Each structure stands twice: as structure tokens, then as C-alpha cells.
Design a protein with these regions (language model features):
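Mature N-terminal segment immediately following signal peptide/propeptide cleavage
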Residues: 30-61
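M16/MPP (pitrilysin/insulinase) zinc-metallopeptidase core fold and M16-derived inactive scaffolds
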Residues: 31-34, 59-121, 186-187, 301-316
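His/Glu-based metal-binding/catalytic segments typifying zinc-dependent metallopeptidases
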Residues: 50, 59-61, 245-303
Length: 448
């Protein structure tokens, strides 16, 4: 089932960027992945010509995520994005859907934490239609109040359907505790409390303030030349006014000086445990070493230390993992596990022990080599479609990685040493300052 909070907060763009950049490697050719062009209206175009099929894929990131929505209007950015396809000054929602379906294409818009995202895929012969539709939904939404009310009801129903899911309850409590009043800390409950008060004016004002060519990155991959795509984008996005982008008031992330336990009562047989703290941003120089370190700790599936200890040696859980959510601002470091209520304390203790061990003991040569081989070896699967290439292009621009990023990546990973692992583990893992959320039958879990 979809996690509504994650859909609202992180959206498609963030999920694609994190997945692609976490494992990108070296391209076979030594040339840059694409070309960067700034259009007359300020829009940044990244183009990768790919002539093997008569198809064009477009990925857009617009600086209109929940980071810039007013603090007292959680969910506004995501709702605005979700309404763009529901009617424009030229087309209603049915017409938009029918026109793209008729040519066998796809068109989508969604909200996220740092960015809103849009995607388009059409045959080369239908590129004009596709760009006409894309520019129309981005530039000319009408935000019909009936559509707003329908989308609000739909979102609230989704939140309500998940309200009793232990994993969602734990995730929301963890997010709120770690990020506080920062935009990354907004939860299902925050969104549900505000959405019913939304009006057309709220969406129109947000759209007018943050949607514009100067806030947009557009990646194009496929059977189209630079001259052709520049001409088409100039044509279909001509007259799109630059966004004023008022500076949002963003609450700082809270500092944490101690370990906190949040015990939530629920009549269930399995305790749902999430523990962690604020992690790193994607642009942190330690990103690559942290990526390798976390693979060894808990990101490497069945080969990770957490899995070896908690699943294989102790039989406490089927799965346990850790992750760093690296975004424009520091995301969360978290470790998650489900175990019997009675073994909750043991599972927590073992996770904390592994956090301490990787901070104090060098990893083995084998662990380091295996992590590097896996991370760099995943590259072919991360650039095997035009959509994935477009996602990487967008990420390259967002995080200032350079168009030669795929060529540099293996060296960046392979340069990580055991000393680097120890250094970044000490810097970015803090077992004495974690938030520990336990959703369980507390009489049996006896969390302390």
C-alpha cells in the first residue's frame, strides 16, 4: 500500500534520484552523459541524444517541493502538483488523459520534498503534442474547486486507510521526532489537519510563486537533435513567466544531545522498530564513503552486518536494514526491523552494538572489496532505459555533479579506504543520540 506521507513528502523525483545516484557507475564511453544548455527563458536543458528507437523521454524537476510551502500549509506543494493534470485553461482532465493515451504516450506530474517532478514519454512523431500537453499543464492549470475537493477527499481517505498500519505509525513518529518543525518533518497527521481548509487561491498563489522556467530543469533523452529540441522548447514554453520565488521561512533541524525512546502502544504480535537521527545531504563530501559504509552496515541486503547478526546469528527477524536518505538538505539515517514483541529490546541492543562496532573497528578487506564491487557493478542496470538516463541527468544538475559524473563515479567509490569508513562512521553515526521508535504491545515488549 502506498505510504501517503512519503508520497506527499518525497514524491517521484526524490525516489528516482536517490535510487540512481546510490549505485551509478562508469559509462562505457568516455564522453559526457549529455549536454547542458540554458534556454532564453532561464530553463536548464540537459540533452542526451539516443537514436536507437524513435522515442523521446522527458524528465523535469521544478523547485516547488514541500521545502518552500508555508509552514502552516503542509501538503500544499504536493496537492498543487497533483492538480496540474486535472484541467487547464485549454483542456479538462479527460481531454488531457485522452490526448496522451491516444498516441500511446505517458504524462505525469507529482510532488516531492525538494522538487515537484514531471515526466513525458512519446514517440518522436508525437513530440510536438507531448510538449504541448506538458507545457499546458505546467503553465495553465485552473485548479477547479471541485477537483481540489475530490483530490483532498482521495488523499484523506488514503491517510485514513493507513492510520493503523504499525509501519506507518512508526515512520511518522520517527520523522516528527527527528526533523521537528523542519519541512522534512511533516507527517500524515499534519497534512490531514490542513488539507480540508485548502482553497483554489492557495494553490494558484503557490503555483504562481514557484512554477516558472527559472525554477525548472528539463532532461530530454531520445531521438531528437539539439537544434530541434531547443526550437520546440522555445516555442512551447515561450512566454512562461519567471517565478518570483518568495524566500520561505524554514525551521532549523533540531539538535539532539541524548538518546530518546518513543513507545507507542498497539495490540500486535510484531514490534515495529525504527531508530536513527539526522544524516547527510547529497552534496556532503563524505557521501561516497558513507554509501560504502552503510552498505557494509545494513544496506547490503543479506550480506550486511545487521542482517548477519540479527537474522542469521540470532534469528530475531527476517529482515533488518539501514539507510541514509541524502537530499538537498540532510535527510535521515535510519535502521528498521520487525521482531517479536518479546525480543524488541534485544534487537535494539544489537543494532546499537553494530553502530558502535563500525565506529570503532576497521571493516575487513573483504567487506570493503565486496561493497565497492556491488555498488560500482550495478551501473548497467541504472542506465538501461531512457527514463533512468533522464533521471541521472536531472540529478546531475540538481546536485552539481558534472556531466562526466558517470565516468568519475567508479573512482570516487574505489578511492574509499578502511580509514575513510571509520572516519565517516564516527562523524555520521551517533548511537548515543538516536531516536528509537517502538510500535508494539508494550506490556510484552517492555522497551527501556
Amino acid at each position: 500500500m502506498v505510504n501517503v506521507r512519503r508520497t506527499i513528502r518525497t514524491g517521484a523525483c526524490a525516489v528516482v534520484v536517490a535510487a540512481l545516484l546510490a549505485t551509478a557507475g562508469a559509462a562505457h564511453a568516455a564522453k559526457p552523459i549529455g549536454k547542458r544548455i540554458v534556454l532564453d527563458n532561464g530553463m536548464v536543458l540537459l540533452l542526451a541524444e539516443k537514436r536507437d528507437l524513435p522515442v523521446v523521454t522527458v524528465s523535469m524537476a521544478i523547485k516547488a517541493g514541500s521545502m518552500v510551502e508555508p509552514a502552516d500549509k503542509p501538503g500544499l506543494a504536493s496537492l498543487t502538483a497533483s492538480l496540474l493534470m486535472q484541467g487547464t485553461a485549454r483542456r479538462n482532465a479527460t481531454q488531457i488523459s485522452n490526448e496522451i493515451d491516444f498516441v500511446g504516450g505517458s504524462l505525469s506530474v507529482s510532488g516531492g520534498s525538494d522538487f515537484a517532478s514531471a515526466g513525458l514519454r512519446v514517440l518522436k512523431k508525437d513530440l510536438r503534442l507531448g510538449l504541448d500537453l506538458l507545457s499546458d499543464v505546467l503553465r495553465n492549470p485552473v485548479f477547479d474547486q471541485k477537483e481540489i475537493d475530490r483530490k483532498v477527499r482521495e488523499t484523506l481517505a488514503g491517510i485514513q486507510s493507513q492510520k493503523d498500519e504499525p509501519g506507518v505509525v512508526a515512520d511518522d513518529a520517527f520523522t516528527r521526532a527527528v526533523f521537528g518543525s523542519h519541512p522534512y518533518g511533516r507527517t500524515n497527521d499534519d497534512v490531514a489537519a490542513y488539507l480540508p481548509r485548502l482553497k483554489k487561491r492557495d494553490l494558484a498563489e503557490f503555483h504562481g510563486a514557484f512554477y516558472g522556467p527559472d525554477t525548472a530543469i528539463i532532461a530530454v533523452v531520445g531521438d531528437v537533435s539539439e537544434q530541434e529540441i531547443v526550437h520546440l522548447l522555445q516555442e512551447y514554453f515561450k512566454g512562461w513567466k519567471r517565478a518570483p520565488r518568495p524566500a520561505p521561512s524554514i525551521a532549523p533541524m533540531p539538535a539532539r544531545e541524548r538518546r530518546d525512546v518513543i513507545a507507542i502502544e498497539k495490540d500486535i504480535t510484531q514490534a515495529n522498530i525504527v531508530l536513527g537521527h539526522i544524516g547527510i545531504s547529497r552534496e556532503d563530501p563524505d557521501y561516497y564513503a558513507v554509501l560504502v559504509m552503510n552498505y557494509i552496515l545494513g544496506g547490503g541486503g543479506f550480506s550486511s552486518r545487521l542482517m548477519d547478526n540479527i537474522r542469521d546469528n540470532r534469528g530475531l527477524a527476517y529482515s533488518v536494514y539501514s539507510s541514509f536518505s541524502a537530499q538537498k538538505e540532510p535527510g535521515a539515517f535510519s535502521a528498521e526491523v520487525q521482531t517479536k514483541n518479546e525480543s524488541a529490546n534485544e534487537a535494539i541492543a544489537e543494532i546499537l552494538k553494530e553502530l558502535g562496532r563500525i565506529r570503532t573497528e576497521p571493516v575487513t578487506d573483504r567487506e570493503l572489496a565486496d561493497a565497492k564491487a556491488y555498488i560500482t557493478g550495478k551501473f548497467p542496470l541504472r542506465m538501461d532505459t531512457s527514463a533512468k538516463i533522464a533521471g541521472i541527468l536531472t540529478a546531475v544538475e540538481i546536485y552539481n555533479l558534472g556531466l562526466d559524473y558517470p565516468q568519475k563515479y567508479p573512482a570516487l567509490i574505489n578511492a574509499v579506504t578502511k580509514e575513510d569508513i571509520l572516519r565517516v562512521a564516527k562523524r555520521h553515526l551517533h548511537p548515543d543520540r538516536v531516536v528509537i521508535v517502538v510500535v508494539a504491545d508494550q506490556a510484552k515488549a517492555k522497551v527501556h
